Design a protein with these regions (language model features):
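Polar low-complexity intrinsically disordered regions
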Residues: 1-14, 18-19, 86, 106, ...
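Short amphipathic alpha-helix that is part of the acyltransferase structural core
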Residues: 2-66, 82
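Conserved donor-binding loop and adjoining core beta-sheet/short helix segment
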Residues: 40, 49-134, 156-159
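Phosphate-binding glycine-rich loops and adjacent basic patches that engage nucleotide phosphates
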Residues: 2-13, 27-34, 46, 84-94, ...
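Conserved active-site alpha-helix within GNAT-family acetyltransferase domains
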Residues: 121, 125, 129-177
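A general secondary-structure signal for short beta-strands and their flanking turns/coil
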Residues: 29-30, 101-103, 152
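Short, solvent-exposed polar/charged micro-motifs at secondary-structure junctions
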Residues: 44-45, 68-70, 165-167
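Short, flexible, glycine/charge-rich loop motifs used to bind or transfer phosphoryl groups or to couple energy/partner
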Residues: 23, 68-69, 145-146
Length: 177
């Protein structure tokens, strides 16, 4: 795997934090029907990831037990896109990871048969907006200037070393290795 991609708030006005300022919500593509992702979706989620991994051929395979762990984190937000037959074709998840600093971890996949339609890029925009919201929620109620209010926050994801398409999407958003 390649190094973790991410950015801190220090990235300035050209980094991904600049696109996280308040504004219109991302529009998820209308090719799919979108709904919140929940633990009840785990079977369909594991099947989607298996389809993607069979094409992408990472050096591992994700099990349904592992995808069930996505929902263990107390603070997460996810969305699933389904086709007209109800088959999950894409998902995106943002989780706040416990650490000394705030880490919003992004994970998602688009079914190989539904790629190159703008779904992945739209999901990344959705994820960065959700990350901003979750980080803001984490800081809500903290006294101004307190450690809780000023703890650095990062938006991160991992990318397979040879996944040039994903690296390009992330680069377009200002993320860097």
């Amino acid at each position: 795997m390649a190094p973790v991609y991410g950015s801190s708030r220090r990235a300035g006005v050209t980094g991904p934090w600049s696109m996280l300022r308040p504004g219109p919500r991302s529009a998820l593509p209308r090719d799919l029907f979108w709904a919140p992702l929940s633990p009840l979706d785990n079977g369909a989620l594991a099947a989607l990831i298996a389809r993607a991994e069979s094409v992408d051929d990472p050096p591992y395979r994700t099990t349904a037990e592992e995808t069930a762990e996505y929902f263990v984190d107390p603070t997460y937000s996810g969305v699933a896109g389904r086709d007209a037959l109800g088959v999950m074709r894409a998902f995106a998840l943002v989780r706040l990871r416990p650490a000394g600093e705030i880490y919003a971890s992004l994970i998602g996949v688009v079914d190989p048969d539904f790629r190159r339609r703008g779904i992945g890029g739209a999901l990344l925009h959705w994820q960065t907006e959700r990350a901003r919201h979750l980080i803001g929620t984490e800081r809500a109620g903290a006294a101004p200037g307190s450690k809780a209010a000023t703890t650095p926050a990062h938006v991160v994801t991992t990318v397979l070393e040879d996944d040039e398409r994903m690296k390009e999407h992330l680069g377009d958003l200002g993320f860097e290795p």
